[in-house]
């Protein structure tokens, strides 16, 4: 088990590498805990860093629990402002819920000054989410220049289902990163996720590598 307060750190050139390292890390170092939605193995603190080498870095692993249709549907939802029958979606929270399109504002901010540290979007609404059951896992994201023409994306999760969601999440975040980079005249580079609680549900363990 990791030391108290010490995060698990994984890095790779592909989402598959990051996913396998994160799952293995949680299996080895995770603690068994009973949570609201069932027993999990978890680490409290995960940093997952991806340095993609090309489009193939985002190929879906053959043994990933979700099929390609599910991954692409999630990817589309991240930029779609419509709720489409859900209690919340990330696209709605990012682009409509707070009365403004945060993605467009980020593009504008980076276009005005690509060295800004204020290109931040949030999904968490404390007025609602502290009392609800269905709440965002992704709570905030920040896009920032790498000091040149590259654009990094940093995402913050309160809770992250590494077993089933990591690959789909990172693919969708990359699409958002590309969307912003293209409109701001930058090139998407690295993608880093910080999760306060990263876990695998015990019922999913037999189906994971």
UniProtKB/Swiss-Prot annotation:
One of its GO terms (biological process) is methylation. It is found in: Cytoplasm. It is an enzyme of class 2 (transferase). Keywords: Cytoplasm, Methyltransferase, Nucleotide biosynthesis, Transferase. Disulfide bonds: none annotated. GO terms for molecular function: thymidylate synthase activity. Belongs to the thymidylate synthase family. Archaeal-type ThyA subfamily. Monomer. This is Putative thymidylate synthase. It comes from Methanopyrus kandleri (strain AV19 / DSM 6324 / JCM 9639 / NBRC 100938). The gene is thyA.
């Amino acid at each position: 088990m990791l030391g108290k307060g010490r995060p698990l750190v994984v890095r790779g050139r592909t989402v598959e590498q990051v996913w396998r390292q994160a799952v293995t890390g949680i299996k080895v170092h995770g603690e068994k805990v009973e949570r609201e939605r069932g027993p999990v193995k978890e680490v409290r603190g995960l940093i997952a860093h991806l340095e993609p080498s090309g489009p193939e870095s985002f190929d879906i692993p053959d043994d990933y629990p979700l099929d390609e249709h599910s991954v692409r549907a999630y990817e589309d939802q991240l930029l779609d402002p419509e709720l489409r029958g859900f209690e919340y979606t990330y696209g709605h929270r990012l682009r409509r819920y707070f009365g403004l399109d945060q993605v467009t504002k980020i593009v504008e901010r980076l276009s005005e000054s690509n060295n800004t540290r204020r290109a931040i979007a949030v999904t968490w609404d404390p007025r609602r989410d502290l009392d609800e059951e269905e709440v965002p896992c992704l709570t905030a994201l920040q896009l920032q220049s790498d000091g040149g023409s590259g654009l990094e994306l940093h995402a913050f999760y309160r809770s992250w289902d590494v077993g089933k969601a990591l690959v789909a999440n990172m693919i969708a975040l990359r699409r958002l990163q590309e969307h912003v980079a293209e409109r701001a005249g930058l090139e998407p580079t690295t993608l880093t996720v910080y999760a306060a609680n990263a876990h695998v549900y015990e019922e999913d363990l037999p189906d994971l590598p």
